[in-house]
Curated annotation (Swiss-Prot):
It comes from Helicobacter pylori (strain ATCC 700392 / 26695). Keywords: Acetylation, Cytoplasm, Endonuclease, Exonuclease, Hydrolase, Metal-binding, Nuclease, RNA-binding, rRNA processing, Zinc. This is Ribonuclease J. Binds up to 2 Zn(2+) ions per subunit. It is not clear if Zn(2+) or Mg(2+) is physiologically important. The gene is rnj. PANTHER family: RIBONUCLEASE J. Its cofactor is Zn(2+). Residues 1-88 are annotated as: Disordered. Substrate binds at residues 498-502. The first 132 residues are not conserved outside of Helicobacter. Important for protein stability. The C-terminal domain is required for homooligomerization. GO terms for biological process: protein homotetramerization; rRNA processing. An RNase that has 5'-3' exoribonuclease and endoribonuclease activity. Degrades 5'-monophosphorylated ssRNA and dsRNA, considerably more active on ssRNA. Association with RhpA significantly increases the dsRNase activity. Degrades RNA substrate with hairpin structures at both ends with low activity, but presence of RhpA significantly increases the activity on this substrate. Stimulates ATPase activity of RNA helicase RhpA. Involved in stabilization of mRNA but apparently not rRNA. Homodimer. Homotetramer; dimer of homodimers. Interacts with RNA helicase RhpA, might be a member of a minimal RNA degradosome complex.
Length: 689
């Protein structure tokens, strides 16, 4: 740089600095003059107040003296000038202190108290924006849960007006032990058949099985427009393909978040929420009665894997406008504090993958795509080839990749039959089976039933999931198989390899404070979960009388001025064999329960009508009643009793095979109950000659 250029630049900088100094000096002078004028005016006000007090004192002693109009006019001008100056400097939300010289601090505190009252009013209005609702409105909505209350899973809810209805989610749940041959449970759709003519659509919050698992079974009976985000519809579409329902994809409606749409008489907006599956949503449902917020399943994750946190701004937007009713996830209502972020799992995965000497086998929910994604990233980091095994895991991962939710290099993946070609320390297997399902890939690996993979002593098996209530025994069984194979198992002793997808108490409080509902219906969970969520809501200022604890089948009506139970409808579960995708009749399940708990007795009798006696060809057998050595005495005892029964039977019974069967069955049933104090299943065939 030349000297001239340097001088020019210095001159320019000097000029700019001078201008800046002049501006600052001017601003300071204006501020000083303004402050001086304000102080002078305040002093004039004080002088005026003192003069007024003095004049008043003199008037009391000289009542006949005429008032000095000259002084009044002079000081009125002074006071008006001061007021004009105050008005010119007044800012909205700011009150100036006027009574600075009143005796003691009385005047000063008066002004401060006005400020306190103003702020209290603002706070009350802010905490209760639902006061803006029209309490004279006759409009109301009716809420009917068909699943998801009094249980974990199976979520389904109807929101309706006299002319229109929407169904929120259609989920499945797992059976408890004792429902033999039943793989999944789905809600009873009877009520939907009753109101089918006014159902405007099915609204999906997210793609977990407990929210979408019943959709194909519903569409086999009833079809409605199905609204959801791309991942939800992608996974539902895959289910429809498995059930031969591909033609019903024409009912799918892809929605965009933050874009309200009309569905029947409702205006619905999907709001982004964080959960243990990507593309989850809360719902803002605007009705004539008021706004309803349904959180869906949620947690408030500030550092999610995809860097897309909960849309708190949009939730707060509706909270400020005024929300009539909040329906919120209660699953983790007993858990204090906050639920850790999904991203907190990364360090534990890093350590486990780094230290693993053999194959790494990671099992989790197939829908937890971010969990799978993180595991695959660490597999790639430590130069492992990835084999994805398990139909649902492969399907979900493929859909997420095709839709662009995750990006992974295809060259890192291999097929299950290629695993044996690589050294063990270069393999990551991502698989299903975290719930101990007997048909899952992990279970079959652990029991040597898988076609390509068996567990080895040097394997590290990471089960990155918590057992769903009802699945504890199944998970324990697969753990036992793995440990017998001498595999290293990382499960619940590693607290940081699994985090919940549901909000704990502090997140529930934040949701309540953001939404500030007038009425509250805690949802998603057993009764103890919603009851605990109720207490959290009360602590956040929701009046107890404005909270109702629902159970499946309850019908609650909500309007701007009231919430009340108005009825109960038939609800329950339908049983499904997941291998055949067919429903199982309730009577079949009951028969299986009888057989399992009390055993079976089989009687095939041949009767001589004339002699009223059993023929020698009659056969008897039992299963699950007595041991083999005790069966003959039992049969002999039953035969003897039947001989006596037949002798006293009339011709009408003996000549009618159906009546003879019923007569025989009732006798055997009573005899066995008398002996064993239980009612086994009885199979009876009767023939008379």
């Amino acid at each position: 740089m030349t000297d001239n250029n340097q001088n020019n630049e210095n001159h320019e900088n000097s000029s700019e600095n001078s201008k800046a100094d002049e501006m600052r000096a001017g601003a300071f002078e204006r501020f000083t003059n303004r402050k001086k004028r304000f102080r002078e005016n305040a002093q004039k006000n004080a002088e005026y107040s003192n003069h007024e007090a003095s004049s008043h004192h003199k008037k009391e002693h000289r009542p006949n003296k005429k008032p000095n109009n000259h002084h009044k006019q002079k000081h009125a001008k002074t006071r008006n000038y001061a007021q004009e100056e105050l008005d010119s400097n007044k800012v909205e939300g700011v009150t100036e202190i006027l009574h600075v010289n009143e005796r003691g601090t009385l005047g000063f505190h008066k002004e401060l108290k006005k400020g306190v009252e103003a702020n209290n009013k603002i706070q009350v209005e802010h905490l209760n924006p639902h006061y803006k609702m029209n309490l004279n409105s006759k409009a109301s909505v009716k809420i009917t849960p068909l699943g998801g209350l009094g249980e974990i899973g199976g979520n389904m809810m109807v929101i309706e007006t006299p002319k229109s209805a929407i169904v929120i989610d259609a989920g499945m749940s797992f059976p408890k032990e004792g429902l033999f041959g039943v793989d999944i449970l789905i809600p009873d759709f009877s009520y939907l058949h009753q109101i089918k003519d006014k159902i405007a659509g099915i609204i999906i919050t997210h793609a977990h099985e407990d929210h979408i698992g019943a959709t194909p079974y519903l569409f086999k009976e009833l079809q409605f427009p199905l609204y959801g985000t791309p991942l939800s519809l992608g996974l539902i579409g895959s289910k429809f393909d498995e059930h031969g329902l591909k033609k019903y994809r024409s009912y799918f409606k892809i929605v965009e978040k933050r874009c309200p749409i009309s569905v029947g008489e409702f205006i619905i907006e999907w709001i982004h929420i964080t959960h243990s599956i990507i593309d989850s949503s809360a719902l803002a449902i605007q009705t004539k009665a008021g706004t309803i917020i349904h959180t869906g399943d949620f947690k408030i994750d500030h550092t999610p894997v995809d860097n897309l946190p909960t849309d708190l701004y949009r939730l707060a937007h509706y909270g400020e406008k005024g929300v009539m009713l909040l329906l919120s996830d209660s699953t983790n209502s007993h858990k204090s504090g906050t639920t850790p972020s999904e991203s907190t799992i990364a360090p534990a995965f890093d350590t486990l993958f780094k230290e693993a000497q053999g194959r790494v086998i990671m099992s989790t929910f197939s829908s937890n795509i971010h969990r799978v994604y993180q595991a695959i990233q660490y597999g790639i980091k430590y130069n492992r080839k990835i084999a994805v095994i398990g139909r649902s895991m492969e399907k979900n991962l493929d859909i997420a990749r095709e839709l662009g939710y995750i990006h992974l290099p295809y060259q890192s993946f291999i097929e299950a039959n290629e695993v044996a070609k690589y050294p063990d320390n270069e393999i990551l297997i991502v698989t299903t089976g975290s719930q101990g399902e007997t048909m899952s890939a992990l279970y079959r690996m652990a029991t040597d039933e898988h076609r390509h993979i068996s567990i080895k002593p040097n394997d590290l098996v990471i089960i990155s999931a918590k057992a769903i209530p009802g699945n504890e025994a199944s998970v324990s069984a697969v753990l036992n198989f793995l440990i017998k194979k001498e595999a290293k198992v990382a499960y619940q002793e590693f607290d940081n390899i699994h985090v919940s997808g549901h909000a704990a108490q502090e997140e529930q409080k934040l949701m309540l404070r953001l939404i500030k509902p007038k009425f509250f219906l805690p949802v998603h969970g057993e009764y103890n979960h919603v009851a605990r969520h109720k207490q959290t809501a009360i602590s956040c200022g929701v009046p107890e009388k404005n909270i109702y604890l629902m159970e499946d089948g309850d019908q609650v009506e909500v309007g701007p001025a009231f919430i009340k139970k108005v009825g109960t409808i038939k609800s329950g579960k339908s049983y499904v064999d997941n291998q055949s995708n067919l429903s199982i009749d309730t009577s079949i399940v009951q028969q299986r329960e009888e057989v399992a708990s009390a055993g079976v007795f089989v009687a095939t009798i041949f009767v001589n009508k004339n002699k009223q006696a059993l023929l020698e060809s009659s056969q008897f057998s039992s299963l699950g009643l007595v041991g083999f050595k005790d069966e003959k005495p039992l049969i002999k005892e039953i035969q003897g009793g039947l001989e006596v029964l037949l002798k006293s039977s009339n011709a009408e019974i003996l000549n009618n095979p159906k009546k003879l069967e019923d007569h025989t069955r009732n006798f055997i049933r009573k005899a066995l109950f008398k002996k064993f104090r239980k009612y086994p299943a009885i199979i009876c065939h009767a023939h008379s000659f």
